[in-house]
């Protein structure tokens, strides 16, 4: 390998990419099972998905992580590299990932196709517009907003109270200027003036619905159950009452179909859906994971950010919908993130600091304990970076051994599947041990307060919950409507176990502050907004987009 570090886009652009029909053959599917989007991308048809439903599912491996740095810790990279490594171990493997959002792609974190020699391709297409799923979701979401405003303009038969509309418009970009807007200005013929706002598309309830719906019938039912706001009697109003679930389903009928692509090493990858884990449930679609489980012996999937967010939601929200719990969990840890949790400055994470690493190790410990609470065996993947010193690697390995934490030093970014062979061996051993005994940490019949308490104490390590006066009133209201039976989806900072992004490591004796609840009945959960978390991110001072370009031949530059 050359000493020069190649960029992700350089590696991906020079890769040998097979026709997606060839990838489908590896899974036992012929060309008729696909709806082609060019030569290298395809959607799986409804007939194909339905034909697989009665097949026995394979083994499921969930990849999660410790609390990350702003740049991310390579969870997607490890997911892809582990999938390739399992393929090299002669396991029929399928990778199931979320689709990237243009917000972080253009912002600071970059895309979500992995990195180095562990990527899904065509990465340029996937990181930009892919098969148009996010655009369809954006269109459906904003169509509903248009229907709401038109209903109010055309007589307002349902008595929608414009002050109590909870449905927001969306765009798949980080755009802080759109968080609060006023619509309907310009006089009587321009609409009814009201306050509105934009979320990022991945925070839309329709995104969550796409990712949790089992089929078109279920999609339509879930869309009809969306609460758009309240009438003047303070009663909830749903899409079903407005009568637009059919039109929304029509807009989304193709977006519900999972997308098939491949890794650099030609392992099949089903990439579909993309809710964030800090402001939504953070998992790819049930349809994609379920289909992958029936096509492969091993399925490697991921859940966003740390185990306190994506993994908790995967295990408490997605697993009941999927009907299958993971057989093993992989927790991705990096030396740079552990140093940050140990007090090292963000500007100094590339410098050797064994002391900070040892201090930050407690963050990893907490996440291993949380996964054990769910009754699932785990392996820690130490995702090696080129800036990691030998002394730091040795210290982290020694700490894992000292505390009985199973681990593997993973170098898939540099070596592809070959860099994850030991991790694959340990994952196979964990899966075949049969030790998985899934325990959900709360029951849907529990009160909202009890569910919140379970998440905060068992997963975050906090001591309790503090509800704002608004949240307290909402709990009374939600009980009245029977909404308290839904799972809780916490909207919380990804950087800390607490709701304070500056409280790193393993904080104790903290409470989680709930400022507001948002009913997402179509998705089938209630969102609890904590701290200052935003559902529309902003751009950094120097967005990644500054380094992006396209040459005269149409080749992308600067994507990662």
Swiss-Prot record:
GO biological process: tetrahydrofolate interconversion
EC number in record: 6.3.4.3
Catalytic activities: (6S)-5,6,7,8-tetrahydrofolate + formate + ATP = (6R)-10-formyltetrahydrofolate + ADP + phosphate
Transmembrane segment boundaries: none
InterPro entries: Formate_THF_ligase, Formate_THF_ligase_CS, P-loop_NTPase
Keyword Nucleotide-binding belongs to the record: yes
GO molecular function: ATP binding; formate-tetrahydrofolate ligase activity
Pfam family, one: FTHFS
Ligand binding (ATP): 69-76
Keyword Nucleotide-binding: yes
Pathway: One-carbon metabolism; tetrahydrofolate interconversion
Keywords, sorted A to Z: ATP-binding, Ligase, Nucleotide-binding, One-carbon metabolism
Matches recorded under NCBIfam families: PRK13505.1
HAMAP family: FTHFS (MF_01543)
Protein family membership: Belongs to the formate--tetrahydrofolate ligase family.
Record protein name field: Formate--tetrahydrofolate ligase
Gene assigned in the entry: fhs
